């Protein structure tokens, strides 16, 4: 006798994806669709019964309204990006799916693959509603040439506020004897930069409470003022840093990519090592 095994035909599935053009940090990004298209291509190859579609051309400034209108019409994409400023609202009104059950049963999923801070940003009241797509850390750029000139060792990865303050204090000076300061410690260092380096956060993990009156933020504000006092509260500009007259400058990684020579139109060149 001859036996036949009949397998059910795989059902065709269409998934919709919501995204905006560019990125959250407003720096040039020619690859936003290229990256998504590549991921879709690989996913559809692994799951040939699934087709993924998305609407291109939605700008970041219009994205929140576009997504909200989709929600009101009951036409939300199956998977979509969420801007940080919308996350708490969307989570609280039920627009986002609880992902905890999925992360627990997916053997390929590893929380350790994400930066802890980025992963936690997708948590609302103890529940995971989103996963990071892009993570952009803030870097501290260092003018190595200036530190070498002043016989100062490069700070290590575990440097402290006190180390930072002492270096800023040492490099800030009048180098040409005209009675005016022309070399400085740091440019564009804000209280929120100090807060993050001090383990503080502006909001609690669920985004429901502001921590402005907390001790870490209070200390960060006081430290920032202390740093500014070294340079007599001078209104410094990026040109001062570009000219090699400032030792430090905080900058996000996305800004850094377009600041140094990179395949964008915004290219800057320096006469010092950093």
Task: Give the ranges of each region predicted by the language model.
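Conserved N-terminal structural module of periplasmic/extracytoplasmic solute-binding proteins
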Residues: 1-89
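Extracytoplasmic/periplasmic substrate-recognition and gating elements
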Residues: 42-45, 51, 264-274
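Short helix-initiation/N-cap motifs at beta->coil->alpha
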Residues: 56-66, 159-165, 233-243
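Hinge/lid segment of periplasmic solute-binding proteins
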Residues: 58, 84-137
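Paired acidic/hydrophobic, glycine-rich loop segments that form the ligand-binding mouth/hinge
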Residues: 78-81, 247-252
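Short, solvent-exposed loop/beta-turn-alpha elements that line the ligand-binding surface or hinge
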Residues: 100-114, 157, 176-177, 184, ...
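Extracytoplasmic/periplasmic solute-binding protein
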Residues: 124-133, 138, 162-210, 246
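Glycine-centered hinge/linker elements that transmit conformational signals in sensory
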Residues: 167-168, 206-235
């Amino acid at each position: 006798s001859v036996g036949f095994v009949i397998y059910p035909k795989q059902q065709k599935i269409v998934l919709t994806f919501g995204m905006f053009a560019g990125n959250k940090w407003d720096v040039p990004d020619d690859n936003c669709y290229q990256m998504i298209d590549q991921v879709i291509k690989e996913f559809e190859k692994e799951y040939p019964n699934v087709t993924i579609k998305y609407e291109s051309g939605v700008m970041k400034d219009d994205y929140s309204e576009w997504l909200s209108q989709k929600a009101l019409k009951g036409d939300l994409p199956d998977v979509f990006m969420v801007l940080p400023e919308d996350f708490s609202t969307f989570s609280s009104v039920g627009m986002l799916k609880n992902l905890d059950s999925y992360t627990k049963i997916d053997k390929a999923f590893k929380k350790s693959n994400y930066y802890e801070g980025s992963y936690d940003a997708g948590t609302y009241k103890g529940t995971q509603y989103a996963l990071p797509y892009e993570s952009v850390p803030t870097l501290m750029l260092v003018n190595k040439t200036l530190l070498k000139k002043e016989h100062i060792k490069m700070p290590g990865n575990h440097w402290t506020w006190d180390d930072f303050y002492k270096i800023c204090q040492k490099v800030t000076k009048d180098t040409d004897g005209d009675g005016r300061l022309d070399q400085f410690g740091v440019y564009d260092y804000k209280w929120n930069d100090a807060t993050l380096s001090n383990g503080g956060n502006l909001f609690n993990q669920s985004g429901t409470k502001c921590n402005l009156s907390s001790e870490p933020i209070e200390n960060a504000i006081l430290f920032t003022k202390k740093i500014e006092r070294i340079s007599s509260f001078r209104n410094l500009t990026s040109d001062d840093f570009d000219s090699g007259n400032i030792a430090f400058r905080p900058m996000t990684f996305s800004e850094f990519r377009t600041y140094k020579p990179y395949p964008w139109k915004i290219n800057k060149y320096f006469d010092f090592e950093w």
